[in-house]
Amino acid sequence: MYSWYFPKDSPSTGLGHRHDWEHVIVWIDNPEVPEPKILGVTPSAHSGYSSQVPPDADKVDGSSVKVKYLSKWPINHALESTGEGGDFQDLIMWTQMTDAAREGLSKTGWGKANVPMVDGNFEAKLGKAWPFGEKK
């Protein structure tokens, strides 16, 4: 799961809210192998998901998936798989964060937004986003 924080989710005047967390889940066949196969991609959109299983070839760049952040006017912002090129972003693993950083993410009041990768949300988000048949 890759997550992004946005200070505001307001695609149109008068609508929206402070704080937004969006995420994309990349489903792989085996995390133990050096080059796992990407089986599916599930980007978040507000409180829902869209899935591509398997992802279209143009939406994958080697071992990375291509995702864009967009405004779904007039309601909210979302992540979506894309065939467009872009930049790579640094990855910070949950286990690389300090205890203070993890605690801050877990205990801060984010209003209507939910931090997807904290212990209280992580497994539920994976279950809701599961794209392979019956939900886990």
Swiss-Prot record:
InterPro entries: NPP1. Keywords: Secreted, Virulence. The keyword Metal-binding does not apply. Disulfide bonds: none annotated. Induction: Expression gradually increases to a maximum at 7 days after inoculation of pepper leaves. One of its GO terms (cellular component) is extracellular region. A motif (Hepta-peptide GHRHDWE motif II) lies at residues 16-22. Pfam families: NPP1. It is found in: Secreted. Secreted effector that contributes moderately to virulence during infection by P.capsici. Causes only small yellow areas at 3 days after inoculation of host C.annuum leaves; these areas expand somewhat and became necrotic at 7 days after inoculation. Leads only to chlorotic areas, without necrosis at 7 days after non-host N.benthamiana leaves infection. This is NLP effector protein 13. The gene is NLP13.
